[in-house]
Amino acid sequence: LDSIPNITAEDIREHWRRTHTAGNLRFVVAGNFVGRIGQLREILNSFELGAGDRLPIAVDEMHSAPAFAIRRKDVPGIGLAISLVVPRKLSDAENEAMSLLNHILNGTLHSRIQGEARRRGLLYYMWSQLSTFEHNSSWDFGAQVSVSNLPAVVDLVTNEMQRVKDGLVDETELAEAKSYAMGRYQMGTQTVGQIAGWLADRYFFDGVIDDFSAVPARINAISPEQIIETARDIIRHNCWTLGLYGSTDKTMADQLYDRFAKLF
């Protein structure tokens, strides 16, 4: 924020020249192009952009951080966030494995964490997801929880992650997660918007055009062992933090941080 007053018009022009080039441009167009391919190419080739280069993605040095709390007295519930980072780009198989694990943990009303937390009246909704970047990947959890239920929710998350770490993923729950993933796959390209979104999700990131027809084989190839080892590797790196948002304080965040630290 302190640097904002120092930005000049020339800084903006230089940024534009460096970033708005054909080499740094990525886009996806989806639809019925029968008889219109030539017109589309003409439009795309009319862009007045220099050749340029694809700009590299910066490498950040990742490390654990202390607990944090963003205090907002006007927010009644508490936003809970937990993030674990591994300093590498996970493979397609590892991404698929973690997607299935996240479904087992938080994907349904019968899932290990969200389902159990709802059954016990601890929260209404909790999510988890795996995000892969060029130089690191993160496994993130989030929920909206009342102050009184925070310790129980963090203990539940910790215990279920420990169970995975201990190798407790069975074929039955994996089969259910695969069935859900196959249904999501079958419904994933019913509109041109979905097709464009599917392709863009990967292509914008690393230039790979994902083979939609190969997805079922990728899903079916995942074993409990693959899930367990991928989760263990993320936990093994011990690079994480926990934070709160709402009408709470740093003391509560520190206490929850210590509870979750038992996983490591």
Question: What are these model-predicted stretches?
Answer:
Residues 1-54, 89, 97, 119-264:
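Charge-rich, well-structured scaffold segments of protease-associated domains
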